[in-house]
Amino acid sequence: MQALCPADHVYKVAVYPDAVELDSYTPEGEWSGYGYEAGGAVLSGYRITVEDGDAVLRFNTVEWLDADIKARTILIYDATTGYALNLTQLERVVGVYGGLFEYRMPDEGVARIG
């Protein structure tokens, strides 16, 4: 896993208000609003765990405080290379205006190799 997702890379989460299919980061169609910067938020808590024989990449929950955000697609990507690691399509558009927007990482991890 560390060969594919090195610990010294920068990882980010970007938000898109529409359903989009991506294999890398693009600013095209990305959310733009108060409290949200283009490119998204830098992820913290990089860790690789072993679960049922699989290597699993995990990060901490991401929070935007006092933000205006509308999301339908969440992209977790390697900002060093631009490549997508995980793309989540939400069932519906969710958002917050002038409040806390929190994204919890997928229970199965961001990436899994087994």
Predicted regions and their residues:
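Small cysteine-rich, disulfide-bonded extracellular modules of the LU/uPAR three-finger superfamily
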Residues: M1-R72, A79-G114
